[in-house]
Amino acid sequence: MRLAVRLPVALLLLALLAGCSWLRHRPTDTPSLASPDELRRAYSLVSDPSRYCDKVHGSWLGKLIGLALAQPVEGWYKEGIRERAEEVGAYPVQGYFPSNFRGIPGCEPWLYGNLAGSPPNDDVEQMLLALVTLRERGVDPTPRDIAEIWDKYLPYGNVASGVALYNIRRGIWPPESATTDNPYQNRIGGHMRVDIWGMVAPGCPALAADLAERDASLAHTGEGIYGARFVAAAVSLAMFERDPKTILTQALEFIPADCEYATYVRDVIGWHAQYPDWEDAYAELDRKYGFYPDGTREREYDDPRFDRSIPRYQWNDARLGLATLNGAACALALLYGEGDFARTICLSTMIGYDTDCNAGTVGAIVGASIGASQIPPYWIEPLQDTYRSHVKPIGKEASISAIARETALYGYQVIASRLIEHP
């Protein structure tokens, strides 16, 4: 009876906050993948709009702040980041890079003093398509649902998502969209865009991982999917947990114990226990996993189909794009960041590899733990509550807080629908 009484009130509050209708819900077609105890605990959060929206808003802000911080050094290695940052007195990294920082070409909009609203980023564009999927297809979307939303609204894709989008628009649907002429199946693309599935399944990591796998299956297999499952589970766990080691250890339960991704993360947990200084742990990580057996960090694909003159195959086989290596880098930043928002995203930025993706991922996890209300204003204010999107249903200038409120609305539906249908 308590659920029946509270459900309409909380839904009404969230619907008013989000400015959208909750009537698009469709019943779930699959088992809940969450225990009754997990669902009841999740319901205690999602039925408290103020507290839940703060958590979701914190995760969205953490994502966007981490991306903005690290975008100027996207795809750089630790040594190059340090060298350029030292040129302008910005090492160790403790804030946004200053306006005189020499970063990647076109990085000026992300530099402090220039940053005025969050510029578009492919990680976020694809997360927003998950939000649109929840809006248009309901809270139990299939891979085909997500793919059809991509087909309809995704303006561009990079690396694995670019190949998958090309396949989808030729009528090749998941899972074949991931396996057809796609050399990037084990890359970071799933890992970098699935935070939202953890946000809408708070404290239900198996459910979050399952939803993330549906999303990642458009463009990834194997380690690429395991990374997506791990990140979504971590965000889900972070909604109730603040200790990074606990989050990482528990998130490992939702990927195969013998997969490479799990091995990399377990190694980082071991190095963290061994070394007080993050740089020593990084040295172990980079030595063991940062290179191919021939000592190189990147190589060309042998298959003539993947000619780099073709736009969707313009990226080579670089270690820094692997889900496994970047998952380990995220784990390192989370452990040595010790739950401190600024320290965690700054460490992630100094570590490098697929730098912006990783800082965004750890920002989303810590942001979910602490909530928007605990993120220092220095980090939030340059975003001006604005994300500039190329996704038409979102709008060219979207309110970040409104995005968070709509996400929270669907999170309520995800939990309440399963609590009713799968008690």
Model regions and ranges:
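Bacterial N-terminal signal peptides that target proteins for export
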Residues: M1-V9
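Active-site cavity-forming subdomains of large catalytic enzyme subunits
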Residues: A116-T221, I225-R229, F240
